[in-house]
Structures are given as C-alpha cells and as structure tokens.
Amino acid sequence: FRFNGPAGSFVEDRVRTCHLFVPGHRDPGVFPFHPKGGDADAPFRGTWDQEHATPYSYDVYLDGEAVRMSVAPGEKAGLFVFDFERPGPHALVFSAKDRVRGRVTVRGRELDGLDVYGNYRGDIRADVFVRGSFDVEPTGVRMAGGRTVVSFPEESCTVRLRVAFSYLSSGQAARSLAAEIPDFDFARVAGGAREVWNRTLGQVAVEGGTDDARAVFYTALWRTYERMVNVTEEGRYRGFDGKVHDADGSDYYVDDWSWDTYRAAHPLMAILRPKEEGDKMQSYVRMGEQNREGWMPVFPCIAGDRHSMVNRHPSVMMLDAWRKGVRNFDAKRAFEIIDHTEETESLVPWYRGPLTELDVFYKAHGYYPGLRTNETEWVEGVDRRWEHRQCVSVTQGAALDAWAIAEFGRELGIDAARLEKYDARAK
C-alpha cells in the first residue's frame, strides 16, 4: 500500500494506492494500481483496517470501493482476486511509477508492463517487467492521465489477475508466470505457499509457552525470512553492473540491510539454512566484484548499494558464517574486497564515496573526530541536516568490523602483517 497523509505509513487510515510488486524492503513499490467499484475516474477510497494477513495469503476489504482484494504469492508471481460487491461499473486502474519510460499495456486479457525501481537518492535504477492475464475479458481499455483504466462487465462480480515479474525481460516474466501460476486457482496457489511456509517454519519446534507466545515466536521467525531475496531467474540474475550473469549453481540474493541483520538474522540463517547463507555471502562477493569501485556493499538492493546507516558489517556476517561451517562462498575473494573497501571507501554515515579527511584522521589516530561546540560542519559528504558525523557510533562500529576482519583473515591464513592494522583499530 501507499498511504495518504504526511506519515505515509500504517498510522494513516486511508490508502492512496496499491502496488503489484515491491522490489525492496519498506519501499513503496512499482506498478501502482487500485480497484474501483464505481466511477473509475473518481479518487480511490479505501482503508486497510479490515485486513487478514498470513505468510501464504492476504486479503483486505476496501470499504470505500466495496471491493475485497485477496492475493496469494508464488516465488516470482502472484494471483490477485477482486470481489466487487456493488453492481455497476467495475475497473482496475494501473500506472507506472516512472512517468518517462514506464508503461502498462492491456490487449485482450493480457497485461504487459515496464516500470523502473529507484532509490531515494536517485543513483540506483533497475527495470522491472511484468506480465499478466485476466480471467475475464475486459470491456474496454483506455488511457486517462497517465493511467491505464481496464473496465470489466458490470455483471462480473469477481475478476482474477495472475502476474509475474522479472528484472531481466518481459519474456522471462511470461515464462515465470506460465511455470508458477498457469491458471486462476487461488486455493492451489495459497495452498502451495502454505505448504512451503509450514515446512520452513516447522524446522524449529518449540515446547511450552502460551498460544500467544508461540504466535509471537513464529511471527518473528517468519519475518527473518523477509530478507535477503533470491532474484535468480532460470539460472541468471541482474548484477550490480546492470548486466545479466549466469548464477553458476549459486543463487543470487539482494535486498539486505546489514546494519539490521548482521547481529541475529544472518547468524540464525547460517544455522537453519547454511547452503542459502553461503549463497548470500557469495552474492555479496559478486556485488563487490561487479560495482565500479570494487567496494563491498552494506545495503544491497537489486541495482546497487543504498549505503544507509553507519559502518560496514558484512565482515562480521562472513566471519560468523565461516565459523559455523559455511564454506560455499569465495571467502578469500571476500576478504580482498573487504580489505580494499576499508582502505578506499569513507566511513561517513549514509555516504558512499571516497575517503575524506575524517577517514584519514581515523586511520592515524584510531577514532573518528567530532566537532567542537558550535563548530560548523565543513567536510563534504557529511549530512548536515540529520545524520551528521556520529563519531562515537562510527568509532565503535569500526572497531567491531576491524576485529572481525582480523579474525576472518586468520581463519583464512592471511599473512599476519596484513592484519596488524585491523588488530590496532579493534583495540
């Protein structure tokens, strides 16, 4: 959902629009759309409070439109069901977030679209393709204000839409749709997703506690699987360089916020799903190899490194995985990328760029310098409005990362002389 109001979140009671697909955690998504239970040109009216969410399905009653919307997920596809309660005109209204290159085209029952995913800074962009089909023949398709309005027979109270997405091509999206959701059987799609989640969550058994306590536990476990996301498509993936690469038997994962996940989520997955965790670490290696600067990312998404928060914690994740026996990633190559990153990329919070005078000071003195009282910031790259230098947090986080790099190097047999600088920074 995208919400009305300044907060733009669940504190708002009105929904502005829905999205067919969300490429990144907490992002607004691509391919905005909404169902209309009346005049398709009137503003969309809906609230989200009458919703029911499970790992394998979601439904919500959009009271302003008198429409119940349900969705069941596949791996790279989904099945939507729209139940219109009011007689009269029914429509689905689609658009693309990117107003320059984006499009949604409907011919007969077939839907084809392109949108562009981008980050808040505008330096990360990736094409997203969608293919879909309706179970009901539209009575009309028209363009209105950059939107594609798809009308359906008034007597058709239920409309189903199956869709699939790809970062590679429209043809790849069509193949994923045919493979994952070949029909409009909602119970089958939701049931298949339920089996997958039941098997996944059932890997951990708990004893004792109340029903509420167990619900909290398994909900938390479910949420740890939100990231990272496997974006391998028929053995290929879109890399940080914008090119299509062969996965070579190691699935490619993106959408990680390592500042949030290095402490618990990654260590847990190294225990529960070691093969996947190794693939995730190898994905980080590939990202480091495929970006222009050769830097290890910290907040990787489909098209690059968001580079949010402070410090660089993939070293901690990789050390932990290695010590838990995860071996299916190129650890020595990972070390070289991490070492190169530490020596050439700045530690300034929320800034992806070369070393600044603050980094030079840190390497010489062992701590990140702060500002004197009432001193005005002058260093290029430091956010003067909100984030600032965060000198204490950066120094503490850098010490942890330096310790992890030194320990990781010793695990790999790296020459001790190369590790001395990290041992010194860790103290």
PLM features: residue spans?
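Accessory carbohydrate-recognition regions in carbohydrate-active enzymes
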Residues: 1-316, 320-396, 401-427
